[in-house]
């Protein structure tokens, strides 16, 4: 039966390490661990690229989840296989990260990001700690009343939430985020001015990790 006539489904288990969803994938035949990050793109540490002999093919300009703009080398992964062997992504573009230091505490070699799942259905089950990846021949069975549509801007999973009355926020559905909701300064100031939120505490520091590494310490509000 042609692939287009049947739905292909892969079950990807994950475990939590330091609040991050960690998954296993085989890169060119070598199984490695990665942070499952819907807010980012596929990225490999330079260390892994060098070990597996994955050459740089291009460069790409990007802005990471911490707002840092940069230009990174781009590589092409010949094969990225799910642990159950059901789905093999081929010719996958990925960013080559300059430093692997921030990833060592998680025991991972990079990110599995949203660009890998373009035109696919991804379901996350927190009870069984599994990620269901399926091709989109069949529509999702979830009730439309429980759905929030994604923005049509690009491939990133951007949704609109309402905070208080009349305050619409465009937010990135980001499984790599350390919290339920992180606000941009402009959104925080807008909500505070409109009485839609209040500050409980204020601190100084940073613990967010993205393709640009660790975020620089700054004032944060809770």
Where are these regions (language model features)?
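Pepsin/retropepsin-fold aspartyl endopeptidases
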Residues: 2-222
